[in-house]
């Protein structure tokens, strides 16, 4: 798990130190304050788990098949840039440094340019620099990243040829857990019997989602609302990492960009409570961005296990800085 990030410079993030908790880390701030960029940095600071290091060699394969992005690197998350965008102009060497909870190791991460000198083709990656003579390596841990692609509506996806079933799935006991939690939230009962072919759905390069029928006529995975679809995707990620922990007894990380998008405020609070429970019981370190003042206020006033959650609020003037002694009155 990630304990500290010291950012020298990455885009607008400059000379910032972030001390995280093992539980829930909420990242908020006005538009353009590099909240999503911070999620990219976190994901970039871990490598994929290899099958050879696992008790159940299929555990990571299963969760990577049903979740859209696992352990994405900065170069893949920024590949949509139309031209080369230097993340730290005129800065040489270290861009940021990470310290991890599980050991005293600190890793420096630096820019590596690749491609042609033509700026239309040039790209960058950010990789650790290992000290000579030390047995250092970037920690391996499953990182599920839920970006805004998860909000794309099935009804607006016009290329049926790209839609494919996902044959690998969680064991039935975990599908039952997802279904139970989903019903608790929505009062919609998912059918998981053998007559209903319960497989995930891969919508091309867009997203992976559930594919199911329900006990209500006319309501299934293709007709539920955007918020209900978003909720299902988030629950799938949480239960996937629970499955991983119960199989391997190892920690994991969940990153969610704009958790509150499409979700009713009551869902946001209930999801926050569920994430606190899952984070504590199944060693899932959670980071999410949010613009929801009601959710932020609830988290700030949450007195139960205060050390298990933390709010970061970014201000811009002109570089991003952290609000000190954060309160909802200061934010409003």
Positions of predicted regions on the chain:
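P-loop NTPase switch/coupling surface
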Residues: 1-154, 165, 169-170
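Phosphate-binding P-loop
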Residues: 16-22, 245-249, 280
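Extended helical coiled-coil dimerization/tether regions that scaffold
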Residues: 145-229, 236-245, 249
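Conserved hydrophobic alpha-helix in the ABC-type ATPase nucleotide-binding domain
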Residues: 234, 271-272
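Loop/turn-to-beta-strand initiation segments
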Residues: 250-252, 283-287
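Walker B catalytic acidic pair
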Residues: 257-259
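H-loop/switch region of ABC-family ATPase nucleotide-binding domains
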Residues: 289-291
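RecA-like P-loop NTPase motor core
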Residues: 296-332
């Amino acid at each position: 798990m990630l304990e500290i990030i010291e950012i020298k410079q990455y885009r607008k993030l400059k000379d910032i130190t972030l001390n995280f908790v093992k539980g829930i880390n909420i990242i908020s701030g006005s538009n353009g304050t590099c909240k999503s960029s911070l999620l990219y940095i976190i994901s970039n600071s871990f490598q994929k788990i290899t099958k050879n290091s696992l008790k159940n060699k299929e555990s990571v394969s299963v969760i990577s098949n049903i979740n859209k992005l696992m352990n994405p690197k900065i170069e893949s998350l920024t590949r949509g840039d139309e031209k080369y965008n230097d993340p730290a102009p005129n800065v040489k060497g270290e861009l940021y440094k990470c310290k991890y909870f599980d050991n005293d190791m600190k890793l420096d991460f630096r820019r590596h340019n690749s491609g042609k000198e033509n700026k239309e083709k040039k790209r960058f990656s950010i990789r650790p620099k290992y000290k000579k003579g030390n047995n250092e390596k970037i920690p391996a841990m499953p990182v599920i990243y839920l970006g805004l692609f998860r909000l794309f509506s099935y009804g607006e996806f016009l290329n049926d040829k790209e839609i494919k079933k996902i044959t690998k799935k969680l064991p039935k006991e975990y599908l039952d857990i997802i279904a139970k939690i989903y019903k608790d939230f929505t009062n919609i009962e998912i059918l998981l019997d053998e007559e209903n072919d319960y497989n995930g759905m891969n919508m091309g390069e867009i997203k992976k989602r559930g594919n199911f029928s329900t006990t209500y006529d006319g309501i299934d995975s293709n007709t539920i609302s955007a918020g209900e679809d978003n909720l299902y995707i988030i629950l799938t990620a949480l239960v996937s990492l629970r499955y991983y922990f119960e199989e391997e007894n190892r920690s994991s990380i969940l990153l969610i960009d704009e958790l509150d998008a499409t979700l009713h405020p009551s869902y946001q609070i209930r999801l926050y409570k569920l994430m606190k429970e899952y984070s504590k019981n199944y060693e899932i370190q959670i980071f999410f961005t949010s613009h929801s003042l009601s959710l932020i206020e609830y988290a700030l006033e949450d007195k139960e296990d205060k050390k298990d959650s933390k709010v970061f609020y970014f201000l811009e003037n002109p570089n991003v800085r952290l609000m000190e002694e954060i309160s909802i009155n200061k934010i409003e």
